[in-house]
């Protein structure tokens, strides 16, 4: 038994199971063990388990707009538009530090019960840093107002409060800047609206500054791409937004995820209809840098690879980012 135990310990130290290795290295080691079908199953909000490798189910969709949402009793703070009226970034930091404490505690409880449902995880799809330009937009209360500077200051503090100081073994939580970009209502046509003829000055002085601040100052771990189109391309398939601006200009190296159903908008009749089917839409989204889908269109990625619409190496890039985040949060460990 001693020899067998020693061999197992040595083997584990050289694999993704070794918790002393950096998260990115562990992700790379685990990636090598996965089949294409298993990789794809990890790329949607309700991530499937891979039992043969000890990967648990995980739900990426969790909410904390002004308190831990939909996960039982929690402290309810004012809506973001109300917190913005305080003009106190320090207060917002304290609020979301408390929110992250509660979220971590709730996750620990649910995990102890072997429950991995939506709203029980560690990846919070908050904050909303879109600009509240038109008071007729019903979801304007989720924003920090009409001013890009104030929105930036508040948003950075939301992220820092949620993600914590990162001085422990694992990250506390991962926050998400949404909805990228040029997304300020109305709701009724967001699945087909095309934001075009946006003047460069308006883009860079109004719509983009909060996201840039959250990436560069806040070190936000996730960015959610919006439903609408930008200059003809769905935001979740926009090379301009997701590759040129977000990753190349700003240096973002985290996860890009879609709003819920946004990939299906690429091809369904009441959406953008920029792509003929789920295979083409999913391939385009991943190639543009959308790592994670809230929805189920990414199931078509297996067939898309077989059809030559996308190389499996592009899938690997996305999956490695997802696994790195899960290791960094400690979610993959006991």
Identify the residue ranges that each predicted region occupies.
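A short, hydrophobic C-terminal helix/tail in secreted or cell-surface proteins
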Residues: 1-3
